[in-house]
């Protein structure tokens, strides 16, 4: 895969995961040009906080993941009016947050790399979805 949009579920797994999917995701992201909406940083921070509070990862692991985050994503995109409009059109199939990733992948004509099986199973999405679990 040359280029992709990557969502927060995939990024959190790549940064803080310990299983086979984390290894696969790290490899895919290293070899690809990765894109994401600006929302990604807030979602990753939120997920890492939850993981620390539930003792899934340590504070140090979360800090290391946050420190690595800026270098993992090649291009971040603002929530432009055009992207928001297209995101809103997808509201019947996925959450607004997930739709931002789908809309960006569609606009860039690249696959969406996700660790979210519910997103991957959503019907009628206009972009290719690659689930890594």
From Swiss-Prot:
SUPFAM superfamilies given in the database record: PIN domain-like
Residues that hold Mg(2+) according to the record: 7, 98
Annotated Pfam families: PIN
Domain of life: Bacteria
Keyword hit for Hydrolase: yes
EC number of this enzyme: 3.1.-.-
Gene Ontology molecular function: any one: RNA nuclease activity
Activity regulation description: Inhibited by EDTA.
Keywords: Hydrolase, Magnesium, Metal-binding, Nuclease, Toxin-antitoxin system
Cofactor(s) required for function per UniProt: Mg(2+)
HAMAP family listed in its UniProt record: VapC_Nob1
Function field: Toxic component of a type II toxin-antitoxin (TA) system. The cognate antitoxin is VapB1. Has ribonuclease activity.
Family per record: Belongs to the PINc/VapC protein family.
Protein name: Ribonuclease VapC1
């Amino acid at each position: 895969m040359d280029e992709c949009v990557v969502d927060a579920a995939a990024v959190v797994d790549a940064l803080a995961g310990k299983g086979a999917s984390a290894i696969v995701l790290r490899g895919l992201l290293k070899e690809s040009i990765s894109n994401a909406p600006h929302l990604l940083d807030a979602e990753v921070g939120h997920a890492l906080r939850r993981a620390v509070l539930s003792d899934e990862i340590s504070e140090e692991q979360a800090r290391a993941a946050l420190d690595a985050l800026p270098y993992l994503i090649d291009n971040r995109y603002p929530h432009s009016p055009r992207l928001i409009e297209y995101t809103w059109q997808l509201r019947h199939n996925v959450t607004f947050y997930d739709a931002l990733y789908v809309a960006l992948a569609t606009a860039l004509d690249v696959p969406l790399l996700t660790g979210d099986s519910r997103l991957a199973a959503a019907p009628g999405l206009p972009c290719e979805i690659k689930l890594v679990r």
